[in-house]
């Protein structure tokens, strides 16, 4: 049976050996070049392939059409992936008649994604395992073919658990590969409601936060012990690494991070105490805890800290253009909740941000981005992160004022993008789910879905193509000029302060605000073309949390990424949205102040939006990039969002002239 293999690390080597032992013919192996910044304690797939006389390749992008064509020419019967670090495109997966299979180091559906070995230790799990599953477009989501459980011992660290996983993988492949070869396998679909997903870890994720319980910190030490980079802390500005530790149920009133004793080296934690058994000062040698204390100059009562003492860092300056808008004002609230951000904002109004105007770390100027170009350029230069949130994003305006949409959404934003290139500033740019247009994929994927729009004589697409072209310009600046960027694509975010009822009165608002206005005024709810179009509605709090994590950019994981931010579980048609909103309205304590419900009315899109309008039937995001880059998933149910949005708007209505 001919196979093409994608492999890396020890698991890649043992997977190749297992295939050869089972009688598979390996036509080619795809692997990675080693990262010089990574400690290579594992076997070399490239060396093994060379020794076995198998062609081996390490392309930067195996999903490039040229490589897809070359793999197709190999005519594989089956494809295997053993710890290959990149997603393999569906075009490649479909080349093998018997399918494609991946070896994953966890008990799927738990711990999908990156670094499951480390994450199970960080989280204090007592069991993990290996899973062989069928590969599909979504990472680690295909049906399970075989699974083997292993116990995690209390004294296991990353390397001992790695060896256990390798041993289990050999057993699993030895048992399963012959069955795949003969087409005799039983597949079990994964339970999506049990799935968890984790992103990759970086050394910066491993600093010891002493306010946490000692057991949590001990698990961190276990998870990143040598040959991983280790857990670390600081004494003043001196960094040191903890290689091994023990938990002590020490009852102490000492502040977390305080040295309780130096022999043994015992540190107070949020709960209990952590003994540092072995460690290393700076780039020195490994030594036992009491010697480390002496080297670092520690005495009883000394304080450790998670960051260098001199880096009580300057607040990150964030420039938000369009700060009074729906996303801008909620994001401002989230940033000011922390103590390390300074927010600079510009907008043509301030009603939504009035609650921040006296905040010492919020600086607002009322103005228009098309007029205040000098102010904007100065503040792009001054700030660290730029979010240009100004745009016309209401569908009726696409057909009513297409040129104004282009001028504001494209031309003005292009100028800001070029300022970011000029001053080498990080830009977080709001793309849109609209760029996917009439894409027919079940899930809209940032990296693989086609962006499909209608003909030129349908001006409703001017917003979509303006945003798409800016996405491409930003991407090109990233590739050619080193622009640090992240593109995020909101999928139907909803919540309080989404537009306002006055905007809805002139038709210039999003769907839920328009529907609320209909209920408030006792006018029929208009269902455009029957309201069967489906969307995935996302609570503003979920969306803002994802956007906040993009700004935080832990480990620079968001650089150069496109990230959908949406809730694929909250899918509903516009008609269903209207029905849910109506039910919430009828139960609201202020209901008696408003006129009777006037019913639903079906209208044609051309009569509502104008003749240049086209709609799309569905728009569901893949959120695998959000899982991978942000460790994020949406949590808030659509009904809760509807209830809170409705309540907010009803309480803004002047009830003095309403019936009681």
From Swiss-Prot:
(6R)-10-formyltetrahydrofolate binds at residues 86-88, 114, 136-140. Residues 1-304 are annotated as: Formyltransferase ArnAFT. One of its GO terms (biological process) is response to antibiotic. Coiled coil: none annotated. Residues 314-660 are annotated as: Dehydrogenase ArnADH. Pfam families: Epimerase (PF01370), Formyl_trans_C (PF02911), Formyl_trans_N (PF00551). NAD(+) binds at residues 347, 368-369. The record marks 102 as: Transition state stabilizer. GO terms for cellular component: membrane. InterPro entries: Arna-like_SDR_e, Bifun_polymyxin_resist_ArnA, Epimerase_deHydtase, Formyl_trans_C, Formyl_transf_N, Formyl_transf_N_sf, Formyl_transferase-like_C_sf, Lipid_A_modif_metabolic_enz. Homohexamer, formed by a dimer of trimers. NCBIfam families: PRK06988.1, PRK08125.1, PRK11908.1. Bifunctional enzyme that catalyzes the oxidative decarboxylation of UDP-glucuronic acid (UDP-GlcUA) to UDP-4-keto-arabinose (UDP-Ara4O) and the addition of a formyl group to UDP-4-amino-4-deoxy-L-arabinose (UDP-L-Ara4N) to form UDP-L-4-formamido-arabinose (UDP-L-Ara4FN). The modified arabinose is attached to lipid A and is required for resistance to polymyxin and cationic antimicrobial peptides. This is Bifunctional polymyxin resistance protein ArnA. It comes from Escherichia coli O139:H28 (strain E24377A / ETEC).
């Amino acid at each position: 049976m001919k196979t093409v293999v994608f492999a890396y690390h020890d698991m890649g080597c043992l997977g190749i050996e297992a295939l050869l032992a089972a009688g598979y013919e390996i036509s080619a192996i795809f692997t990675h070049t080693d990262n010089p910044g990574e400690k290579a304690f594992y076997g070399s797939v490239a060396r093994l392939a060379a020794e076995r006389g198998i062609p081996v390749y390490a392309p930067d992008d195996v999903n490039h059409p040229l490589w897809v064509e070359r793999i197709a020419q190999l005519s594989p019967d089956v494809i295997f992936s053993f710890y290959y670090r990149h997603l393999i495109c569906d075009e490649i997966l479909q080349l093998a008649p018997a399918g494609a299979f991946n070896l994953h180091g966890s008990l799927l559906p738990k711990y999908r994604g990156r670094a499951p070995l480390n994450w199970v230790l960080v989280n204090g799990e007592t069991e993990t395992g290996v899973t062989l599953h069928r590969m599909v477009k979504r990472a680690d989501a295909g049906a399970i073919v075989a699974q083997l459980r292993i116990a995690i011992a209390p004294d296991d660290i990353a390397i001992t658990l790695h060896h256990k996983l390798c041993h289990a993988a050999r057993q699993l492949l030895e048992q399963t590969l012959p069955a795949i070869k003969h087409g005799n396998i039983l597949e079990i679909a994964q339970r999506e409601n049990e799935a968890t997903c984790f992103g990759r870890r970086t050394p910066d994720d491993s600093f010891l936060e002493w306010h946490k319980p000692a057991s949590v910190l001990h698990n961190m030490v276990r998870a990143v012990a040598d040959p991983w980079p280790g857990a670390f802390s600081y004494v003043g500005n001196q960094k040191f690494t903890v290689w091994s530790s023990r938990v002590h149920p020490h009852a102490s009133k000492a502040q977390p991070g305080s040295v309780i004793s130096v022999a043994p080296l015992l540190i107070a934690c949020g709960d209990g105490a952590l003994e540092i058994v072995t460690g290393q000062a700076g780039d020195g040698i490994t030594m036992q805890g009491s010697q480390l204390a002496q080297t670092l100059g520690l005495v009883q009562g000394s304080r450790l800290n998670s960051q260098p003492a001199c880096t009580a860092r300057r607040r990150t300056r964030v420039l938000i253009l369009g700060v009074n808008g729906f996303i801008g004002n909620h994001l401002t609230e989230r940033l000011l909740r922390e103590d390390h951000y300074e927010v600079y904002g510009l907008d043509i109004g301030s009603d939504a941000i009035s609650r921040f105007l006296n905040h010492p770390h919020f600086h607002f100027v009322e103005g228009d981005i098309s007029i205040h170009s000098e102010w904007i350029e100065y503040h792009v230069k001054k700030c660290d992160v730029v979010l240009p949130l100004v745009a016309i994003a209401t569908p009726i305006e696409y057909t009513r004022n297409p040129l104004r949409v282009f001028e504001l959404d494209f031309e003005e934003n292009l100028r800001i993008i070029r300022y970011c290139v000029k001053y080498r500033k990080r830009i977080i740019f709001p793309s849109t789910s609209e760029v996917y247009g009439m894409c027919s994929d079940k899930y809209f994927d940032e990296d693989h879905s086609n962006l499909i729009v209608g003909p030129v004589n349908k001006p409703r697409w001017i917003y979509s193509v303006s945003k798409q072209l800016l996405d491409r310009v930003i991407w090109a600046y990233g590739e050619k000029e080193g622009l640090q960027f992240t593109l995020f694509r909101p999928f139907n975010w909803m919540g309080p302060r989404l537009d306002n009822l006055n905007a809805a009165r002139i038709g210039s608002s999003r769907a839920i605000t328009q529907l609320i206005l209909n209920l408030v005024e006792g006018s029929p709810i208009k269902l455009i073309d029957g309201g069967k179009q489906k969307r995935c509605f996302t609570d503003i709090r979920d969306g803002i949390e994802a956007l906040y994590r993009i700004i935080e950019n832990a480990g620079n994981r968001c650089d150069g990424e496109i990230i959908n931010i949406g809730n694929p579980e909250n899918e509903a048609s516009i008609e269903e949205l209207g029905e849910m909103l109506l039910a919430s309205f009828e139960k609201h304590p202020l209901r008696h102040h408003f006129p009777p419900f006037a019913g639903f009315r079906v209208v044609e899109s051309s009569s509502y939006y104008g003749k240049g309008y086209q709609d799309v039937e569905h728009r569901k995001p893949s959120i695998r990039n959000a899982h991978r880059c942000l460790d994020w998933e949406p949590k808030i149910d659509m009904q809760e969002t509807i209830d809170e949005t409705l309540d907010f708007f009803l309480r803004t209505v002047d009830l003095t002239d309403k019936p009681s």
